[in-house]
Every structure is written in C-alpha cells, then in structure tokens.
Amino acid sequence: MQNINPTQTNAWKALEQHQKDLDQVTIQQLFEQEPTRFNDYSLKFAEQILVDYSKNNINQQTLSLLRQLAKECALNEATEAMFNGEKINRTENRAVLHTALRSCANTPVYVDGKDVMPEVNAVLAKMKSFCQRVISGDWKGYTGKAITDVVNIGIGGSDLGPYMVTEALRPYKNHLTMHFVSNVDGTHIAETLKKVNPETTLFLVASKTFTTQETMTNAISARKWFLAAAQDESQIANHFAALSTNAKEVEKFGIDTNNMFEFWDWVGGRYSLWSAIGLSIALSIGFDNFEQLLAGAHEMDNHFRTAPMEQNIPATLALIGIWNCNFLGAETEAMLPYDQYLHRFAAYFQQGNMESNGKYVARNGEVINNYQTGPIIWGEPGTNGQHAFYQLIHQGTKIIPCDFIAPAQTHNPLSDHHSKLLSNFFAQTEALAFGKTQQEVEAEFVKAGKSLDEVKEIVPFKVFTGNKPTNSILVQKITPFTLGALIAMYEHKIFVQGVIFNIYSFDQWGVELGKQLANRILPELTGDESISSHDSSTNGLINQFKAWR
C-alpha cells in the first residue's frame, strides 16, 4: 500500500472549496434541484439490499470529487493487494485475508507463495462434522447425555462477532442454547454457570494464543466448575473445544487437539467470525446456514472488488463518511437498526471501526494533525433510541450522521407491530432531512385554534432545522445471506476509509499499553502494603481499594 497523505491530493483541496460552495445548500434544496434524486443516489445489492444515500449533504460534484480522492489515494491498488494476500498489515507483517475464509469460488489465494484455501476448506469441513455430531445428539457428555448448552468463552473479536450474529439469526436457531462469556469480571462467568448443567454443557474456548488473560481466566474457572461435578479430568475432552492455534497449551488444558479448530495470523480478531471463531454461530444455526452467511459475505466481496466506483456500495458509504467527518465536522456516526434481533450490531461495528481506524499515526510513521481519522461509532435499536438520544440528533448542536437499517419483512408478524416499526424508520430520516420550519409550527397552532400571539414564546422550541445527514439501508429480510452481506459491506467501508486516511487498519497497538500496566499492577494488589510506585492518582485509587476490599 502506498503512503499518500489525502490532504495533499488535488481532490482534497477541491473538496475543501466545494464544501464552502455547498455550505448554504440544504438537503431540502438538493431534493428540489434534483427531481430524480432517490434514483440517482441509491444502489441495490442482489435485489435484497437497498442503500439510499440521497438524504446526505452531497451532490454529483461531491461524489465525483470523492471518487477522485479514492483514485488519487490508490484505492483500487490497495483493494487488489488485500484480496491477493499481500502483507498490507505492515506493522505486524501480516496479510489480511478474512475474504478468503468465505471464498466459495475456491480460487487459489496465496500467502508467502502458499495457497491457503486447502487449509481453510479443511477447517470448514472439520467444523461441519463437529456441528453435525453436537446438533444431532451423537456427541455425549460425561453421563451419556446430549449437549443442550454451548458456552463461548472469548473476548473482543472472539466474542462480539459470534454474539452479534447468533442474536441476529435467532429465528434460525436450533435447540441448543448459546451463552457468551467475555468479561474478566467473575460475575459474568458465575451468572452464566448458574444457568447450565455440567452434564450437558459444551465450552468453546476462543483464544488464538490460548494465553489471553480474560479468556483463560474464565476458561480456568469453567474448568474448575466442570471438574467439581465430573470428578474426572479425562472428561474435559467431551466438554471443551478450543478455537486456537496453540496446540501445546490446548493439550495442557486437557482439550483433545482433535477438538481444536485452527485459524491463521492473517485473520484479524475483529474480522474472525468467518473462521473457526464462528463455531458458536454454526452450532446455533446449523452449518448450512453458516455457509449461507459466508455466501452473502462472499457475494459482497465480489461486488466490492468488481463494481465500478459509481455503483460500489461499500466505497460510496465510505466516501460519504469521509465527507461527513472531514468536511462537515461530524465526529460520530450512529448505527440505528430497526430490528430487535440486530441489537448488538452497533456494538460489533463499534469495535470493527474504532479498533481499525482509531489511529493517529500515518503509514509513513508521522503524526496525523490536519485531518480526522475514524469516527466514534455508537447506536441502539429503533424505536428504543427515539426515546433516549434522538432528541440531540434532531435538535442538538452536533452533527451526527446516522445509518438507519431495517428489514422489509419481519420474522415475527404480530398484529401491526412491523408496520408501526417501519413507519418510524421512514419518518425519522424524513424528519432529520427536512425538519419543520417556524411557519409550519405556527400553521399547526393556528389549525389547533391558537392565536400566534399566545404561542409565540413556545414556537422556537418546536422548530426542527432538518438538514441532518442519513443513510437508509432497507433489507428484504434478515437471513444468513443478507446478514453476511451487510457485515461485509461495513467491513469494506472501514477498509476504504483506512486506505484514504493513510493508516494501518488491521493492527490495534492502542490496546497494548493498558494491558502492560495491568500486568504490572496485578501483583501490587495482593498485599496490604501502601503503594507509591505510580502517580498520586493511581496510588490513591489502589490504596483506597486495598482499604475497602
């Protein structure tokens, strides 16, 4: 990947001037100027996903300049480098090939001259066989009973992705009950173990190195709990499987290495649900549905790699995001799924985006000080969010671009619930884009029989300025295929932005310092002696903790 400062490109300079020219033009005026705006500013994927980006502060010149920016920043070359297995994660000297995990085409993909696809397919075949045994009841626990509960123990990418997907695809789940334990807080594992029976519980320990502090702390506690009931260490093999690459540590734990599912250093944690880390997904929804999840992602990979920029959904969303955060002053993006099954979608991409693009050092090692990199990602399902934080989005002083996501078909057609849900979905983006003028507020009062004189003091509070940017993503139905495509769409959006931000999106050095300091502090917490080895604040906090515990 090349080292190109985006602010030094001709397109960036032109965009700065263009922003000034467009500054006083509202979204409403853009719709008035362009009668076919919806058709011109929306794209479809596989006739199952519609992405409408018309309610943004952009026109065709904006898009043209943003596409020029992508070209000047060598996006196409970077995309091919990723798909071809080049080591684009330079700080760790790794390829980035989560796309290979879902490559249904079986086209060879080379890393260091070796085709990785045979190994990928071998792990998938092993996962399929394992899932069939557990789901069918052939796999027995230590008392001869079939498995009823699966506990996935992992953190970060080993937890957020599998948890999000199993929740999103609950309509497809089988009889197995899934549990996810991530936090090193003992409460998380303790409360989970209260719900399960050691005779019928399978634990998946998800840690590439099998040394992750939080994961192994929880796994050891689960092991102790299990052995207290089973009283036989040889039975660990029937109740624990490992998603790891460290066979030595897995075996030491007591897990049969036949029940160890590998993945590779070219799979980043936050892009790993497509790998063996997704075993909990496959156990929950069945392997056929897991393959559909992969197929949807693969289809989006093909779209992203081959569609021209004008029709390229991930690239378009990425470029609009760059426009919003670097030219319009937005600092956050809200992800608002109008689907309760997607209640962890924003949390998943909070990690996906912020761990990838939350960087301040450019690819040449220099500090970035004249443009913004990754935005803050947050969100909640609709309509819950409407009764919580939408007030600020509508009438606050900050610009918050929003992605509204909704399925046209529901899995639970109860009464008129879905129509009411979707009426809110459509209404919110309309309200955010077009607002309500003072004249409209006054007209409402007059219609209600009020005189303008008696309401003049309240009128300003009921005005909505509008002109708030949104994308609307309408999915025909949330299925394994469409969910896979949606996830891959956002993955590639993050990639595009990282290329243009001139950063390395696939490392996460920012998580290391806190870990190092925690390892230093941990032994200091054992005794009763006063601590003085830190700053006065940290010393004071540790010493108060010791006094109170």
From Swiss-Prot:
Keywords: Cytoplasm, Gluconeogenesis, Glycolysis, Isomerase
GO biological process: gluconeogenesis; glucose 6-phosphate metabolic process; glycolytic process
Entry's Gene Ontology molecular function annotations: carbohydrate derivative binding; glucose-6-phosphate isomerase activity; monosaccharide binding
Keyword ATP-binding: no
One annotated Gene Ontology cellular component of this protein: cytosol
Family the UniProt entry places it in: Belongs to the GPI family.
Name of protein: Glucose-6-phosphate isomerase
The species this protein was found in: Histophilus somni (strain 129Pt) (Haemophilus somnus)
